[in-house]
Amino acid sequence: MSRVALDLGFIKIYYYTIFILLAIVSATYLIIKESRKQNIDKDFLINTIYYVIIFGILGARLYYVIFEWDYYIKNPLEIFAIWHGGLAIHGGIIVGLIFILYYCHKNKVSNLKFLDIVVVGLILAQAIGRWGNFFNQEAYGAITTKQELINMHIPQFIINGMYIDGNYYQPTFLYESILDLLGFVILFLTRCYPYLKIGFLTGLYLIWYGVTRFFVEGMRSDSLMLGPLKMAQVVSIMMIICGIYFCFIRNIKSKKFENLYQEGGIRHEV
């Protein structure tokens, strides 16, 4: 299966790049649309999105390179070839989160309210971005048979794409993409519930994606490892714990319901 969507001779456009860009555009559109309802300062919003995209991509790449250092120390120029794949979403989330917390604090914007807006677009972006993994033939699971994939009603073009180096593999990218899309629907519908507390959507995202990634990662055969541990599963457990705190423990302490779309602004509520 070709990774190249368009070959212009002087430049090649990869499917991976296309889906990453689609993911970024989709998330940006949703975040801007939702932010307008909260009267977020335009300059703050543009600057935040701009830097989060940059730092998120850098963080995702750095995270991947660190855990594949044995390869990249021998092929240093490949560090910059992100179109070949190798963006670890956990790295992007961690670095992006650090920047958002810093920038919200600097501008006196409620970080949790802003994150409640961001996570809705983020999980949709993750669902789209996983298709870049498909065309790069990465993020796949254990060896299986063609008949088993047919029995699971996997589309033929995906079955063909999961034929790698003489074997068929489980399309774990597809499982995660579907679960991310379902998570998006849940977050999107939940966001307007009249009895939400600030941080609940952020917590729900952390729990949903943490559980999703933990189980999908258990099926993958190309995981980033930290000794005997699958690093993504370690981070997923931490996400679930943080999500439980924001959804339940923190909310129990807060007696006030603060629905995003009934408050009319997110400033000065850090």
Regions found by a protein language model. Name each.
Residues 1-270:
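A feature for loop-to-transmembrane-helix boundaries and adjacent hydrophobic helices
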